[in-house]
């Protein structure tokens, strides 16, 4: 094996494998999430997840008139990419003093995420908006059976899944902050190939963060953004 590309949900989950790669002189390129800060990783290629949260905060704040109550429905609390999205969102939303983040719910901290989200909707009948910070949570929220009084809640999601694209077309979701999986994969493989070159012949930038894009009804059919749309 001459090089390894890895993605970790939780940064500590690959520690032993990273140590083994280092001992055997195998360069490691991390992509997407999980091990960006490890000294055992030669390079990282992935989305700027802090920016994902910031864009979501700006778009949600704008959509609800820069005032009101919002909730964050999140995935694994220990996942680095999710941590960055949540912190990006909560830090940016402080620019709007009339907006209150009333709840942050993590899927790995509850027994039933659908029930937990419904509990938030029931607890805050005047909730104005929600940020679903990954594709699975967004799709789960869209699948929930909600009464008509909840139709006015503004939703912003992450990654333009087929279900979220349909929700945007049907005005059930204001928009989605989407990653570009092709660019992420291309950058990762290209960087892995560069690690096989003589050390002094190429310069490999340690961290490359790929900007996400905002997708809504105004640009979802624009071919320019087709690489940000997911088939499933």
Q: Could you say what each language-model-derived stretch is?
A:
Residues 3, 8, 42-43, 69-77:
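Short beta-strand segments enriched in small/hydrophobic residues
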